[in-house]
């Protein structure tokens, strides 16, 4: 696996994976850095290479491996279909192939027969002592809800005043874990952790490994169209997702997520949705599309999901 070091903990469960850490700010920076990266990876003598990113940087590597006769396949971005889905006029509103299945296609073209219908989820991670010490004052009889209220772009973020109503209600009978990072997000989340008894800021855990321990033991994750929903889905945690300027038809819904767990902004009122794959493009008048998602309906759905037996590890 070639990726940023922060993602290493995701692959800890696999004993036969070698994680190669990118140094994009150092020896792998820029075009010269890509050449260095190619030389380092070439020394590993891979028999098969899967480019699951298909962006400019990985395209350069694809070309270098290709002209050196390595067996390499890359991800299809479905650019033609995406353009038709995201354009504002004459939009063709039909679902693209989910990203997880497009990843499988890459491996299948390399000769590996992957079938997600027989997928096995990993079990919850063991909550290590260091993490337990930080959460040991929590009630043991409550179900755990993760809430990740932020996303990479504003077009995917549920209004914080409405999200606070969700937090306020759900924390009465459930333990809430808030997920966010960076000074701005933490400053917003700390308002809620200080205001409500059963709300904990997961940024206080101090490491991504500890956050994964909590995520894998949740009973429910509430997320935007963002990474935390995918991380929870990796552990078969139910995900209730809220969608703004993006849409599940774009192919980026959490793995095996149920349609009834996805709350979509009103397309009758805002027909340009989805405006892009990542929610960066905000058309004029579309700044508040997510206010069309009724937080009461989200609460009702969350309570329905939480009727299932408690999932998390007993502390």
Residue ranges and their predicted role:
Residues 1-315:
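Catalytic machinery of carbohydrate-active enzymes
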